[in-house]
């Protein structure tokens, strides 16, 4: 068997291994026109996939243990993406943090999460601050650019909800950055 702990620290294992986790699969509360996950999410729903669309507790534990064990560097980054990762409850991420501590074995664990920001609440922001998450907010520029493609499931604009989420992050002192999709309308 391959034991990476006994391997010399050179390529290909000398660099950190990064993986994006999709705890809610393609589930999302928005219906962005350019998003390829929306179609996949609708397909899964039509097939009655239900709970198979989300990361199970069993798979979360297995992945966490194996991901940390595979690291040859002291720092491990868990990068939570979607769909919309806030479609999972805070209790899911509390369990993830417990598992990270359980399997850390001296590694420094960091967490970042990419969200559309519309589901942020005081409770989420307090959780992120307490646990030192870096939050990425998906926002495509000013209101008129953002709302062109980033629409709610009902077809309405989402910019004001994203800005409300950003204000909550600031209120709670949560570190955040922005990610924009450059497209034909905002370029």
Spans of features found by a protein language model:
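N-terminal charged/capping segments associated with class I S-adenosyl-L-methionine
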Residues: 1, 40-41, 48-51, 58, ...
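N-terminal [4Fe-4S]-dependent radical SAM core
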Residues: 1-22
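Short secondary-structure boundary micro-motifs
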Residues: 3-10, 52-54, 62, 110
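A generic fold-level signal
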Residues: 13-14, 27, 73, 130
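Canonical Radical SAM [4Fe-4S] cluster-binding loop centered on the CxxxCxxC motif
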Residues: 18-56
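Flexible, glycine- and charge-enriched loops at secondary-structure boundaries
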Residues: 21, 49-57, 86, 152-159
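Radical SAM/AdoMet-radical enzyme domain recognition
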Residues: 60, 64-79, 88-187
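Short acidic donor-binding/metal-coordinating loop in glycosyltransferase active sites
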Residues: 82-83
């Amino acid at each position: 068997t391959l034991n990476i702990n006994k391997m010399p620290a050179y390529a290909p294992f000398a660099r950190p291994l990064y993986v994006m986790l999709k705890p809610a699969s393609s589930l999302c509360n928005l219906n962005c026109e350019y998003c390829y996950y929306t179609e996949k999410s609708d397909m899964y729903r039509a097939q009655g996939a239900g709970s198979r669309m989300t990361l199970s507790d069993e798979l979360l534990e297995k992945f966490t243990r194996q991901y940390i064990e595979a690291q040859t560097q002291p720092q491990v980054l868990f990068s939570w993406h979607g769909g919309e990762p806030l479609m999972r409850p805070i209790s899911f991420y509390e369990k993830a943090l417990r598992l990270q501590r359980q399997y850390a074995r001296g590694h420094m664990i960091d967490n970042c999460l990419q969200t559309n920001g519309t589901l942020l609440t005081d409770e989420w922001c307090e959780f992120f601050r307490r646990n030192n998450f870096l939050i990425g907010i998906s926002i495509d520029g000013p209101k008129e650019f953002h709302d062109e493609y980033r629409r709610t499931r009902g077809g309405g604009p989402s910019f004001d909800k994203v800005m409300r989420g950003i204000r909550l992050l600031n209120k709670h002192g949560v570190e955040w950055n922005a990610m924009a999709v450059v497209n034909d309308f905002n370029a």
